[in-house]
Amino acid sequence: LQIAIARDPAFCLLSQENIDSLAQYGQISYFSPLYGSDLPSADLVYLPGGYPELFARQLYRRKRLFNQLRDYIEEGGKLLAECGGMVLLSHSLTVRQGGTAYEMANIFPFDFTMTTRTNAGYRQAEYHGLALRGYESHYTETANPDGNLFTATPVYTMRGNSTSVPLFRYKNVFAGLVRWYWGEMDMLDLWKKVPTETNSPAFPSFWQKNI
């Protein structure tokens, strides 16, 4: 497998154990959304967490990469986006209340706004029998009017309380605000569990290519 991982100051929350887990299955290459890299040819793309809010203006300008991500997704490419990686796939990111809403890749219709309130804690989920464990930590509020169209499975605290943001799926894309731990698991199992009769919606009307 050819595995492409985003890595730069905006997407830097990478677990070495997760990288080692992926390295068992193929060759890893890195690219930088922040510095204008093209999307490498890949069988799997991993967008980890980080601090996109610190570089929102620069990321907003990466229209070429956004279009490459859309083409990759429409062609059935596998992609996992965690926390900051999910923000990159959202409709927009507002760094402060009342500030500029910077358009992101516009894969999902969610609008993120940075706040002073943290959401943090260990999380768990189950996707078609696959048990997931990870950690969530962010300062964002999410407006997702069409979010239910994309829900793959709910996410819970370790005490069993539901969280506000589930794990989302569109085609072969999984996205959420949790940074999952793959050290003792096979990340590729996510796609093995995708039902044959997929109920992923067509790209909704909000989706438009950036010119």
List the model feature ranges, each with a label:
Residues 1-64, 70-72, 112-115, 144-146, ...:
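N-terminal beta1-alpha1 cap of cysteine-dependent amidohydrolase-like domains
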Residues 7, 32-35, 48-50, 83-86, ...:
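Active-site proximal loops enriched in glycine and acidic residues that flank catalytic Cys/His/Asp
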Residues 28, 79, 173:
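Hydrophobic anchor at the start of a short beta-strand
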Residues 35-37, 76, 158:
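Short loop/turn hinge sites at secondary-structure boundaries
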Residues 52-128:
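Cysteine-nucleophile active-site neighborhood
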Residues 112-211:
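Amide-donor transfer/coupling interface in amidating biosynthetic enzymes
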